[in-house]
Amino acid sequence: MNQPQDFPPQKSKALWYAQLELGFRFDGQRTIMNHRKHHGPVRVQKMLWPEKTGVCHAIIVHPPAGIAGGDHLTFQVSTERKAHAVVTTPGAGKWYKTNGKQAFQHIYLNIANDSTLEWLPQETMLFDAAYAQSETIIHLDQTASFMGWDMLVLGRQARLETFEQGCYANRFKLYRNHKLLVADTLRFKGKDRWLSSCLGMNGHAVMGSFWAVAPEKYRATLYLEQHIELIRELMMRMDVPVTLTLLDDVVCARFLGDDVRACHDAFAAIRARLRRYWFDLDEEFPRIWRT
């Protein structure tokens, strides 16, 4: 991964590694976790099957509750044919102040034909003076489906903290059959003009991105445009600062504001609608979100 020039040099021996590998398959009745391997304090807290269709809800937890300078955290998740998994976290993630040390997070998702993965972590807080690099790489087979989001909060809002120093870089890539469908790159420093510019954050503290790929039979532009228009009307009724676009057959929603709960609720509502349209499933929010 290309490193931003704004990051201070970091020796690899100072890095602290944690890794979690998960695999899901359909056993004929429900989706089960057939592969689980972890290194360091990151693991699956609980698996639940709250839906009659056998969708597996997995809660992953990183006990230190955040990523500090020198940490190197990796998630690898794969699904086999006909599996449907929902992966979430019990609370907000955190990028801690690092005293100049870099921190890394890598997310690799591989989704097989006729399977679905919903990657739904709760928000991530970027502390002032954090040096953070994050990447998400998603590979879908031709008939695979995906929904996922990323929500970032600049500073600790309860302390009125802003992002005055440090650096953040995020790279998102989504492929289908090894063809790049979406590439999204974000990079900024503390006090960067982009944070106050109307072409960037415009002084806001919360940003979010939502991505979704429909089952193959719903990828026609006519279907997707109808679904997006209905969701736009819902966002207007909810009075949230969300925009929706269609990138080929990938649905993209963006949030820019100051209320992370509003971002979460908006994205959860979009997910609920797409589940109904594409899979004939109820919204079925992960129970951990209500605790």
From Swiss-Prot:
Chaperone among keywords: yes
Cellular component, GO, one term:
cytoplasm
Give the keywords, sorted.
Chaperone, Cytoplasm, Nickel insertion
From what superkingdom does this record's organism come?
Bacteria
Entry's HAMAP family?
A: UreD
Assembly notes? UreD, UreF and UreG form a complex that acts as a GTP-hydrolysis-dependent molecular chaperone, activating the urease apoprotein by helping to assemble the nickel containing metallocenter of UreC. The UreE protein probably delivers the nickel.
Return the protein name.
Urease accessory protein UreD
Question: What organism does the record attribute this protein to?
Answer: Acinetobacter baylyi (strain ATCC 33305 / BD413 / ADP1)
Q: What gene is behind this protein?
A: ureD
